[in-house]
């Protein structure tokens, strides 16, 4: 399949995006998605502000684990579809406040992220196939960097007393945790994941934006020993500090147990439903590029970069 040429001024568009974001969140440290392919292993932090917790309500802490509660578990989250959720930097203005919602346990350890240059090693370590497009648009060139996130399982036991003490210590008001949620254990099974990126700088001191990313991960699952998805959503959305618009968008999700919210920068991107390889997907269009995400046969796929929506869809359809 031939992919048409495209020559956007990606650098100018990206500079404009950076300026708008930095203007609104100059006091905040870089987010996790700005450091997604680095040598540092990802760390699980207790849920932060209510807005952050609300956005992650359906997948409370993707990456957690199974320890002695399998017989009591009820599935509360296993995504097969996607919905856009409009967010702005101001929704996370207090993201530096970290609250302790309960005890986290790993089995045997937190997920690790490895950056590799060898595709065979990346495929072997992830257990996922290396995907190649039929052709690449001009401007998208190698070498390709590979990131492998290990499979992880773990558990979070929600604890009202710990949350209350953490909120008091940080000077933050939270609504009391209901008895139906207090003491529930959430078990999360996630990964592995494989990321292929074109155009990243080889220098760790020089920031760069990839021209193309192809990613895939096994569908994560979240199980609970007590609290239901509806109870978790209702409680988290009731917390002070959750923007009403954000809460309304999450409440509007018809089936939160099978739907993964995709945060979209407000005013910077639009979305639409599309068909990808015979299944429904979500296409994201922005001034500096485009992306598409879909799920098929228990794997979530994503393609994106400094390319047009038509090119994104052509690449997604040609993966082999």
Predicted features, each with a name:
Residues 2-44:
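Positively biased amphipathic helices and basic secretion/translocation or surface-docking motifs
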């Amino acid at each position: 399949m031939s992919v048409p040429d495209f020559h956007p001024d990606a650098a100018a568009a990206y500079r404009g995006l950076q300026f708008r974001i930095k203007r609104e969140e100059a006091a905040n440290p870089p987010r996790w998605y700005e450091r997604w392919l680095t040598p540092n292993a990802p760390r699980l932090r207790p849920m932060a502000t209510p807005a952050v917790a609300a956005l992650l309500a359906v997948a409370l802490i993707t990456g957690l684990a199974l320890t002695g509660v399998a017989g009591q578990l009820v599935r509360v989250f296993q995504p097969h579809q996607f919905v856009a959720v409009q967010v702005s930097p101001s929704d996370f203005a207090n993201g530096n406040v970290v609250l302790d919602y309960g005890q986290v346990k790993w089995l045997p350890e937190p997920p690790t992220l490895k950056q590799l240059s060898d595709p065979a090693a990346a495929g072997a370590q992830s257990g996922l196939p290396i995907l190649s497009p039929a052709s690449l648009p001009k401007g998208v060139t190698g070498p390709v960097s590979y990131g492998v996130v290990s499979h992880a399982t773990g558990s979070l036991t929600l604890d009202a007393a710990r949350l209350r003490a953490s909120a008091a210590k940080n000077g933050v008001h939270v609504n009391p945790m209901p008895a139906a949620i207090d003491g529930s254990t959430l078990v999360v099974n996630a990964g592995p994941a494989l990321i292929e990126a074109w155009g990243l700088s080889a220098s760790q001191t020089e920031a760069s934006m990839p021209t193309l990313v192809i990613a895939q991960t096994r569908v994560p699952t979240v199980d609970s020993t007590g609290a239901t998805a509806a109870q978790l959503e209702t409680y988290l959305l009731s917390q002070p500090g959750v923007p009403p618009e954000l809460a309304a968008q999450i409440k509007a999700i018809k089936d939160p147990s099978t739907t993964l919210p995709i945060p979209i920068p407000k005013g910077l991107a639009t979305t639409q439903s599309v068909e990808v390889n015979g299944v429904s997907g979500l296409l994201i269009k922005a001034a500096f590029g485009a992306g598409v995400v879909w799920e098929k046969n228990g794997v979530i796929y994503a393609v994106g970069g400094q390319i047009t929506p038509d090119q994104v869809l052509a690449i997604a359809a040609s993966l082999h």
